[in-house]
């Protein structure tokens, strides 16, 4: 009986070992599956994190592009307003240039007229009134006279026609204005033609 008991025990033992091996194999298989699932989850998490980072980068780039576009539109609007303002201010420039000879001729007529002659007096008064009205009208649109007699010579506003020595004037001073200059809204339309003291 002892052999039989041993045999049974050996058979039982083999069965137990076999079952234990099956359980161990199943445990290893389950562990491998869990590891695989964990690896898949880690891979999925890494993939999702990469996608999130990529999306955040795209959003930031798009926000930057939107800000740049807004700034560009604002700059364009400001430049356009400045150009329109300049166009308004200086649209009359060519027209003003054409009117200057008329003003010059009216002034020459006033200077050349004999104010003492009775026949000429009413005509002279009419020319003076016409000149005043004309100058007032163009000054409303920003045209101003440059008459620098006695002032320091400034090449931005004056054109030196001659230079002469003069004990009565300081050096580099306008002694005489040959032709008045004009400016339109701060921009010189025609410089004053002057004689400068040496």
UniProtKB/Swiss-Prot annotation:
Keyword field contains Chaperone: yes
Keyword set, alphabetical order: Chaperone, Cytoplasm, Stress response
GO cellular component: cytosol
PROSITE patterns: GRPE
Molecular-function annotations in GO: adenyl-nucleotide exchange factor activity; protein homodimerization activity; protein-folding chaperone binding; unfolded protein binding
Domain of life per record: Bacteria
InterPro entries in UniProt: GrpE, GrpE_coiled_coil, GrpE_head
Classification via SUPFAM superfamilies: Coiled-coil domain of nucleotide exchange factor GrpE, Head domain of nucleotide exchange factor GrpE
Cellular location(s): Cytoplasm
Pfam families xref list: GrpE (PF01025)
GO BP: protein folding
Role this protein plays: Participates actively in the response to hyperosmotic and heat shock by preventing the aggregation of stress-denatured proteins, in association with DnaK and GrpE. It is the nucleotide exchange factor for DnaK and may function as a thermosensor. Unfolded proteins bind initially to DnaJ; upon interaction with the DnaJ-bound protein, DnaK hydrolyzes its bound ATP, resulting in the formation of a stable complex. GrpE releases ADP from DnaK; ATP binding to DnaK triggers the release of the substrate protein, thus completing the reaction cycle.
Record text on subunit structure and interactions: Homodimer.
Family label: Belongs to the GrpE family.
Protein name: Protein GrpE
Source organism of the structure: Vibrio harveyi (Beneckea harveyi)
């Amino acid at each position: 009986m002892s052999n039989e008991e041993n045999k049974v025990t050996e058979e039982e033992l083999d069965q137990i070992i076999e079952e234990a091996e099956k359980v161990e194999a199943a445990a290893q298989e389950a562990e491998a599956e869990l590891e695989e699932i964990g690896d898949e989850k880690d891979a999925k998490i890494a993939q999702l994190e990469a996608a999130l980072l990529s999306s955040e980068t795209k959003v930031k780039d798009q926000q930057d592009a939107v800000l740049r576009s807004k700034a560009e539109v604002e700059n364009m609007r400001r430049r356009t307003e400045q150009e329109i303002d300049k166009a308004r201010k200086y649209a009359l420039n060519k027209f003003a240039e054409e009117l200057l000879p008329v003003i010059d001729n009216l002034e020459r007529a006033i200077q050349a007229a004999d104010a003492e002659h009775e026949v000429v007096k009413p005509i002279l008064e009419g020319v003076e009134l016409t000149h005043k009205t004309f100058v007032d009208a163009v000054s409303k649109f920003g045209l101003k006279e440059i008459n620098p007699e006695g002032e320091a010579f400034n090449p931005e506003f004056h054109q030196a026609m001659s230079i002469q020595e003069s004990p009565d004037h300081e050096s580099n001073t306008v002694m005489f204005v040959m032709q008045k200059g004009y400016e339109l809204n701060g921009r010189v339309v025609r410089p004053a033609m002057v004689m400068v003291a040496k």
